[in-house]
Structures are given as C-alpha cells and as structure tokens.
Amino acid sequence: MAKLTRKIPKKTKRKFSRGLVHIQVSFNNTIVTITNLKGDVLAWSSAGACGFKGARKGTPFAAQIVAETAARKSFDRGLKQAQVLVKGPGPGRDKALVGLFKAGIQISLIRDITAIPHNGCRPPKKRRL
C-alpha cells in the first residue's frame, strides 16, 4: 500500500509597502540594508556583492549601484515608501540616495545616524605624502 504524502503549503513572501533603508558608507565600502518597520531584513546589497573590487568599492558610483540593486530587490517585495538612515563619513552618501530615487522608492525621511565621539578614542595620525 502506498504511503499518503501531505502537501505542505508553500510559504508566500509577505508584501511590505513601507520600510527602512539603512545605508552604511565608509571610505572602503558601502552596505545597504532594507528592512521592514520591525527590523526584519527584506533585501541587502554591498559593493563587493555588486562586482566591485578593491578601491572601487568606496567610490560614489559603487554606492549608487549598491542602492539601486537593493532597492530593486525590495521593490519586488512591494516596498514603495521608505525612511533612510545614513551612517558613516564615506564619499557615496549622496549618490546612494540618488540610487534609491532611480529605483522608484519614495523617501519620506532622511536621518543621519553617524556616531560622533564625545572625545573617545584617539583618531589615526594624519597621512604624510
């Protein structure tokens, strides 16, 4: 006698219309993470994942491509409006926002959450070229 197999329903991906875009920009790399309002990750992208290597990962162009890639991934999940949290001193801060605009995500808020030391660690010495 053949065994009966139960069909397990396939999990459907939930649609989210609003979310948060976390942009972490350093001098060496750019990482964009898109979450829902609870903080669950919907999509992410980084300069290395987009095919940039070495010093090109820290460029403004790489930041724009990274933001577009992550935004397209989340746009497929239904994201239309987002709040943007930018962290870090890198050169791609503004271009990452341009990438989000190009992908068609409406930005309702831009907040800078870069950590500012209250005279904490000693900064690295200045370069002499």
From Swiss-Prot:
Record keyword Ribonucleoprotein present: yes
InterPro entries registered for this protein in UniProt: Ribosomal_uS11, Ribosomal_uS11_bac-type, Ribosomal_uS11_sf
Cell location: Plastid, Chloroplast
One BP annotation, GO: translation
Domain of life: Eukaryota
Classification via SUPFAM superfamilies: Translational machinery components
Chief localisation class: plastid
Molecular function via GO: rRNA binding; structural constituent of ribosome
One GO cellular component term: chloroplast
Keywords: Chloroplast, Plastid, Ribonucleoprotein, Ribosomal protein, RNA-binding, rRNA-binding
PANTHER family xrefs: 40S RIBOSOMAL PROTEIN S14/30S RIBOSOMAL PROTEIN S11 (PTHR11759)
Family: Belongs to the universal ribosomal protein uS11 family.
Quaternary state and interactors: Part of the 30S ribosomal subunit.
Name the record gives this protein: Small ribosomal subunit protein uS11c
Gene: rps11
